[in-house]
Amino acid sequence: MSTRQLRGSAVALVTPFHKDLTVDVEALIRLVEFHLEAGTDIIIPCGTTGESPTLTEAEQASIIRTVRDASKGRIIVGAGAGTNATVEAVRLAKNAEAAGAEAILSVAPYYNKPSQEGIYQHYRHVAEAVSVPIIIYNVPGRTGCNVDAATVLRLARDFANITAVKEATDNMQQIAELLDGRPEGFSVLTGEDPLILPFMAMGGDGVISVAANQIPGAIKRLVDSVSEGNLEEARKINRKYRRLLRLNFIESNPVPVKYALTRMGMLEETYRLPLVPLSAASKAEMDRELEILGLI
């Protein structure tokens, strides 16, 4: 796969469950078809939004295979495959590659509070274990550690298959350092939907999006508008959906977006503990916005 393909509008796909908490394969296939119709560039199951901490390894492999088969080669299929024990992260990455993932989204090692050298060594072992492209996933709000720009750029220079970073922060200085220092072909993607417009205006390559679960076409148009230099159209799209992008994080992701998809008739409102359903007050806010946008 060309590294230049890891750009554009990517969706951090939710995992639909039945009421008995088994994976709803039929709903999963419907979601893939929804993204094929909308023109989403990359689909990434088994990440944070996919409730990966609650999935077994067998379930993760099955989900990746299902998404790959349903996509029929028309969309790049990545997969979340990371954890905070390097040996386990390597195994998960190998499993995802074997299941058909064309790229690996590997979260920074959380809870352990490693040094930057420890983070480098963690990703070195993952990169040496697989041949598919690796996306470094920097989400310090969840992991408790930041992957510094210098560490990302060092990894990008040292390993040909570390081809992108998902920068899920609002640290614009760090984002600027990544954009200014990256080697040719290395993609910098935002993980913050509200920042798509300014992030891409700075030279970013796209987004791995939560909101693309609900509005894949709009997120695709927003990304493409900025890429094409049509900032007026991008501002119009951003203005229309700004409140929805915020409401998706009114409670812990992916609870709000899965509730919205339930209201849109895409899946059942089911989560695995410790996630629980959206509060009544938050449901009312989400319902109002979905009605305003004509999504329900």
From Swiss-Prot:
This is 4-hydroxy-tetrahydrodipicolinate synthase. One of its GO terms (cellular component) is cytosol. Pathway: Amino-acid biosynthesis; L-lysine biosynthesis via DAP pathway; (S)-tetrahydrodipicolinate from L-aspartate: step 3/4. Homotetramer; dimer of dimers. It is found in: Cytoplasm. The active site is at Y137 (proton donor/acceptor), K166 (schiff-base intermediate with substrate). The record marks T48, Y111 as: Part of a proton relay during catalysis. It is an enzyme of class 4 (lyase).
